[in-house]
Amino acid sequence: MSPLQWLTISFALIIFHSLTVSSSVLSHSDRVTRLPGQPRVGFQQYSGYVTVDDKKQRALFYYFAEAETNPSSKPLVLWLNGGPGCSSLGVGAFSENGPFRPKGPILVKNQHSWNQEANMLYLETPVGVGFSYSTQSSHYEGVNDKITARDNLVFLQRWFLKFPHYLNRSLFITGESYAGHYVPQLAELMIQYNKKHHLFNLRGIAIGNPVLEFATDFNSRAEYFWSHGLISDSTYKMFTSYCNYSRYVSEYYRGSMSSMCSKVMSQVSTETSRFVDKYDVTLDVCIPSVLSQSKVVSPNQVGESVDVCVEDETVNYLNRRDVQEALHARLIGVREWTVCSNVLDYQLLDVEIPTINIVGSLVKAGVPVLVYSGDQDSVIPLTGSRTLVSRLAKQLGLRTSVPYRVWFAGQQVGGWTQVYGNVLSFATVRGASHEVPFSQPERSLVLFKAFLDGHPLPEEF
């Protein structure tokens, strides 16, 4: 019997079984009794491994925080960070929208955690990221988007075996940065799988500052730098005429850097200054920097951070033995947990493969899509994302259902938004960085709630 057939039979049995089993049964081995230094909370947490390839012993690590209140009536949301190769546990759960943030030896409550509105599932993917591992190091080589999407699909299938009462729950997939590749490709596989075995109740995807189309996303950086006064007129001309950013990245990863691109990027780097955080151009920087979020989107600036003015509390916390024991986590083949993988050899040229066309197919299939942008991010600027969404709406023949306007959060302008055909949405988040939930937690929560509810963003206080 093939693994797929076995899974299908297992799901049928579980659906029947889950009708008679209460949620109390979920006090299984993955339950987190209490994280070290954690404040008292009323929701359940789980973490552990799901094997995605029994033969090769490849396992993905997850952290699951149920909703603070009424988890049985709230949707399931999968969160994926990008990189490729950066941790959804360290960046997403413990620095952005999860229930806690490390502060010295303790955890403090995130007052704008997304598990106020949903059951949040964070996945360290692909294998080789964070606590996710393979027993054979050769499996870290040549990893690409297709392998990652396939493993993520198998993860979800098998995760439902652990949590059967979430099988029919509304499911949303969210993420940021290179998750602009991860999220649409996973959603596409889910829709294909559902044609034969209806398993996933996919209700929408939301991606923040996403890599969707190589040239448009990357080349919008020049205009962003120039419009924010970070480069001169002459450098802007060089950056748009002689060597744009997509050409630079392409040459960089092919190991064939031209003298022209080297000269242009040297001038751009000199003018923008290494003391300006490209992920949040308004943020004052400190040394040392904190959390590396991206290798692909900024190859000459590996090591930039979520917040460069804060000590790396997350790395210290997740490398504590007592924390790893509480999370049921293991270090396999590595000496320490890192925010972004040092062992993963990802096929970085996959960044050149557009995923905006997959987003279009999802929209045509009736899956609501939200693309949102922190407006202080110069790495994947809002201008590129806005252009791509507008262009896609035109290609699909979608008319504007919510004209471009401001939206509000906490009696302040939260950003701007436009909706096409009540299924494709674009929104900016005012004052937000590449990592929107980190830099603007309240506004990101308002955005998240509206997305889950299927409502337009608030147009008044």
From Swiss-Prot:
Gene name of the record: SCPL45
Organism of derivation: Arabidopsis thaliana
Bridged cysteine pairs (disulfide): C86-C340, C243-C261, C286-C309
One Pfam family cited in the UniProt record for this chain: Peptidase_S10
Keyword Secreted attributed: yes
GO cellular component: extracellular region; plant-type cell wall; plasmodesma
Record-annotated membrane-spanning stretches: none
Listed EC numbers: 3.4.16.-
Protein name: Serine carboxypeptidase-like 45
